[in-house]
Curated annotation (Swiss-Prot):
Highest taxon, organism lineage: Bacteria
Subunit field text: Part of the 50S ribosomal subunit.
GO cellular component: ribonucleoprotein complex; ribosome
Function, as annotated: One of two assembly initiator proteins, it binds directly to the 5'-end of the 23S rRNA, where it nucleates assembly of the 50S subunit. One of the proteins that surrounds the polypeptide exit tunnel on the outside of the subunit.
Organism of provenance: Thermus thermophilus (strain ATCC BAA-163 / DSM 7039 / HB27)
UniProt-listed GO biological process terms: translation
Keywords: Ribonucleoprotein, Ribosomal protein, RNA-binding, rRNA-binding
Disulfide bonds: none
Protein name: Large ribosomal subunit protein uL24
Gene of this entry: rplX
Amino acid sequence: MRVKMHVKKGDTVLVASGKYKGRVGKVKEVLPKKYAVIVEGVNIVKKAVRVSPKYPQGGFIEKEAPLHASKVRPICPACGKPTRVRKKFLENGKKIRVCAKCGGALDTEE
């Protein structure tokens, strides 16, 4: 089953609820099967790693953990506010994401 996501990699988002409410960051990765996103600088966890060629010291590393996608809202580049996403069809048949508040496009046209 394909899950429709309202955010894409590279979007600037606001965390709307939870422990990190109010924080703004860029989406590093989208995980549609888990309906989750990894946001830069948000939901930092400490992970124990064994000694390996990648981590010669071992010990603990800090990394971003996935955040449920319903907790984030994309920030509209036109109005600068966090918004819900609507879809709109263009004349050429392409579907783009649109800001629900101002109607500005969230996708850059290729």
